[in-house]
Amino acid sequence: MNHFVFFSFLILLMHSGIFITHASETDWENRLFIKKECIKCNLNKHDLRKAQLNNVMLSESLLNQAELQEANLQGADLSGASLRGAHLEGANLRGANLRGADLEGAYLNGADLTMAELEVANLSSSDLRAVKLLGANLQGADLGNTNLSVSDLALSILKGANLKNANLQSANLRGADLSKADLSGAILCNTQVPSGEIEYRGCIIPLLLESFNTKIQDQ
């Protein structure tokens, strides 16, 4: 009789949804890695380092503060997704669709976004050092206060983009479309501009900062 009551209780718990956490976790893993489709999934703070997520559908998903270092997201659909504060260092995002995605404060240094779709995406205050954005579409994107030093933006579309106070030191902008882009306050030091010429006029700011930091360290 006791065994009967125990198993009846277990069945009741299962039907009441107590085990939904385990079931839902298995579900998103199946959708993400097997079906390659996890639209509007909540993956906030998930550890997906070095995950093979090429061509996966993740549109409108939540990936805030997710660990995606060195993940393969080539050709992935991340349109409208939220990746605020996400770690994407060294990730492969070649040809990925990030249209309208929110990447504010994300860490993308060393990531490959060649030919990626980033129209009207929010990349403000993100770390984009040494990022490959060759031929990427950044039309209307918000790149305010980003660190784009040593990045490759050759042939990229930056029409109407916000680059206010962006650090473009040693960046490559050869052949890029910067029409109607806001570059006020941007650092252009050893920067290759669309014409192919090297711009040095903004070097005074990083030099002053370097001098200031040196003095602080010497104290």
Language model segments and positions:
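Tandem repeat scaffolds
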Residues: 24-219
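Bacterial N-terminal signal peptides
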Residues: 7-17
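Sec/Tat signal peptide C-region and signal peptidase I cleavage site
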Residues: 18-23
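Positively charged n-region of N-terminal signal peptides that target proteins for export
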Residues: 1-7
